[in-house]
Amino acid sequence: TYEQMSLFEDTENKERQQTERQIFDEALELIAKDPNFEKKKVIVLAQENWHQGVIGIVASRLCDMYYKPCILISHTNGVGKGSGRSIKGFNLFDALTHCEKQLIDFGGHAVAAGLNVNMSDIDSFIKEINKYADEVLTEQDMIPTVDIDCPLSERSVTLENAKLLSKLEPFGMNNEKPVFALAHAQVMNIAPVGADNKHLSLRIVKNNQTINCIGFGMGEFAEFIHQ
């Protein structure tokens, strides 16, 4: 029945979210244990039996969070399968091409790619891709930038306008999500909320108008936003 299908999909979605959160937390632990993390321009993390269907999503989150190219690798029986996401100015496919001697195979494009690697070659791969990144990425490239499509007034921030944006979907590489800016506003009451603090709550105030905001799955960004 429809109800059974809906319940199954809801359960499956919750399990995927739990798996994603677990991998994300484990990735953060690996980062915290790496004394050379700050020096590396490319994040490469490997763990046994990470879920293949989720590592790309987590790689994307880490890429946004640290503004570094990120590759997550799940390995079994000495062979790793990886999924990577990149930042502006760093062509991930070109980087993997440069490291092809350390890889079994790879594919993808400038901002997203997949790879297979023997775990016996993982250390040399990490060294080589970071060496390449040092050559092609400047310190300026590592500073996050945001391309604004349109400035907003506080009166334009409505649910009706948000729903209108859905008419532009589907978003993707050749149809990126539009980015709007509400300038000279005050950000207040920043806090992670929800189960496991995985969502973000904040309040924006401009010209005596208050806008309550929620960012789903964005709880980890709370510490990076300043009032």
What are these regions (language model features)?
Residues 79-83, 188-191, 222-223:
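Noncatalytic, beta-rich nucleic-acid-contacting surfaces in large DNA/RNA-processing enzymes
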